[in-house]
Amino acid sequence: MRINVLFIGNSYTFYNNSWDIFKKICLAEGKKVNVDQVTCGGYTLEQMNDPLNEYGAKVAEKLKNNKYDVVFLQEQSLRPAIGDEALFYDAVRGLTQKIRANGAIPVLYETWGRKEGSADLTKYNLTNESMTQKLIAAYGAIAEELDLFVSHVGTAFYDLNVNNPELEIYDLDASHPSSFGSYLVALIHYATIFDKSPIGVEHTYFTDIYKQSIAEKAAHKAVFGDSILKDEYKTSSEGVTKTVSN
């Protein structure tokens, strides 16, 4: 059976062609997949949910004219961590309704906190840990409300940033993923939608077997291990909205 996958997001989705790495991992593991995407740098899910927006119209067109099995949703990387959770929640609600009408399964692509030294952390009075926790909390809250799957990429990034910083999961901008980080992203997406451990996948992205092994173990832990969300960051999305009732 062939699986049709659509990615909706921004540069965190298309950086280093991580969607293509995902496809190659799937194919190497005997999973037949078609991969499609609607992405634009810096975009929010609010824009992707707006049919009057250029890319929002593309999302609507894709969902109208194609049949998908899985659709990944990736929010602008700061929005859920800087007090704009309601806009994030509303967009996920709207897109989830459209995706389910297509017959597909929505999956949230949980992103990560900026690397230490990022100007954005200073600007918003965040740390790598606090930004990570806020993102995990927001993605988890709307996932619980709408009964969604979450691809816990941010969880794995935090794990490796703390425990294996020498492997450099970040690009030089302290925001986007390095090539190693993009491989990690792809592994987690694969494990999430197929409910299969990524340890020992056939596709060899790195000639460095040690780095590949670390990525596979971190991906497995993020998908199948316990949540790292701390109690003080736990939240609910119920009733949190920017939508004005008539």
Model-derived features: positions:
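Mature, Sec-exported extracytoplasmic domains of Gram-positive
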Residues: 2, 41-45, 54, 78, ...
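Alpha-helical cap/lid subdomain in secreted, periplasmic
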Residues: 60-179, 191
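Conserved catalytic region of serine esterases and O-acyltransferases that act on ester linkages
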Residues: 169, 176, 186-246
